[in-house]
Amino acid sequence: VFGLVPIQDKKFPLILFSHGDGGLLNQNTSQVEELVSNGYVVIACNHTYNASITFDKDGRPIPYKQNVSWNEQAQYHKKYYTNLLINYRYQDLAFLLKTIKKDSFNEKSVNPFKNIIDFDNVGAMGHSMGGGTTYIGMLKDNEIKAGVALDGWFFGLLDKDAKTNTKKPFLHIGQEQFLDSNIDGDINDSNDGKRNFDIY
């Protein structure tokens, strides 16, 4: 983007993007491009162990749900598809926000974005589980002022979080009913999932 069109001498609102379960940071490129074309800065990350693949600082791949066998899936869902995983994912967004405010990313690299971002206007957007991550981010972080969930997945929210009004603008774009409420699977495997299914 740098060099194509001179950046105006102004600050732009920031949107943090959270991908879905097993997704990637670039999975919603068309929506991100549209937002950037309309004056937003969008930053995305891969959620380690919950993206289809990420890489550590030495370039080694970190696959999705590392070391979780098919036999362990049900227990994995009970433990991680509740509040814990969504909170880990929110911590990734909080880290992004903290990092983008720094003057430099390391001793050799100046942060070219810090001075063009309006940190008083930060929002979050996510797809599926990223929508739940966005909602938790709005509850926990005063800097996140608004959110959008694209077919949001909210089954991982604890009752207290699911019933809390953020008092912030939040748009959920998705179907009225995610699944048949009588099915077995992720919803019933989650301690809070069955109850929160009825809320959303």
Q: Model segments located where?
A:
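The feature captures the conserved acid-bearing segment of alpha/beta-hydrolase catalytic domains
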Residues: 6, 145-200
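Primarily recognizes the serine-hydrolase "nucleophile elbow" in alpha/beta-hydrolase
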Residues: 96-164
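A fold-wide structural signal in alpha/beta-hydrolase
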Residues: 13-14, 36-48, 146
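Serine-hydrolase catalytic-loop signature spanning alpha/beta hydrolases and amidase-signature enzymes
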Residues: 22-24, 42
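The serine-hydrolase catalytic nucleophile loop
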Residues: 25-30, 47
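Domain-level recognition of soluble alpha/beta enzyme cores
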Residues: 1-14
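Short beta-strand element of the alpha/beta-hydrolase
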Residues: 11-20, 33
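Alpha/beta-hydrolase active-site loop
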Residues: 49, 54-119
